[in-house]
Amino acid sequence: EFDKIMKRGVGLACLHYGVEVPKGAPGDHFLKWIGGYFETNWSVNPHWTAEFKVLPNHPVSLGVRPFAINDEWYYHMRFRQNMKGVTPILSAMPGADTLKRRDGAHSNNPHVREAVLKRKEAQHVAWVYQRGKDYEEGRGFGFTGGHNHVNWGSDNVRRLALNAIAWIAKVDVPKGGVRPGEVTVGDLQANQDYSPRGWEPEKIESKLKE
């Protein structure tokens, strides 16, 4: 049923845990819909500070400046063969300390060690996908961050997400990107069931002003 919707050219954005589906038919559909997904025993889910030093010339990155931010950035995603139709938006080089956990479905595996520790391949943690005519030229967006709610306080993160939503909806992204508005500590704390561990409003307020 959902594939029928995708074949009408409807855009699809998947964030954080939303990019993980089982290998097989679900994963194959994600490759058709958004170009990539988190595949167990292939992809990993460490917390680390990713440094995004260069951004591509693409509507989704308009107005987004190079930045660094700590999150549970999944990486070594399973993408379409030869990255056909996939454009990386956020890419960074994970440190060796992200691969110190024992092997497991989400933690570590020989494939990711080969890619990062030996071949030194930068890892794509946000990307866009242009579907073909069989899907009415629909568009997809994948973003592996989003575990740390406080990161929505970052203008760069909000602008990138808003740009992506506009792009997959086939709306022209403004030259400077979609305006992300202003977010306060109070906004970030609103409607949460409880304050996250280590929640320090003054520190967060200071970071938002940087």
What are these regions (language model features)?
Residues 1, 72, 117-118:
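Generic detector of contiguous secondary-structure segments
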Residues 1-24, 143:
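Short alpha-beta junction capping motif
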Residues 3, 31, 61, 161-166:
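Non-transmembrane alpha-helical segments in soluble domains
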Residues 6, 10, 34, 38, ...:
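A generic secondary-structure signal for well-formed alpha-helical elements
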Residues 7-12, 84-87, 136-139:
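Loop/turn elements at helix/coil->beta-strand transitions in domains of secreted/extracellular proteins
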Residues 14-105, 177-210:
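An acidic, glycine-rich "communication" segment
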Residues 98, 105-210:
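Extracellular ligand-binding/catalytic regions of CAZymes and related secreted enzymes
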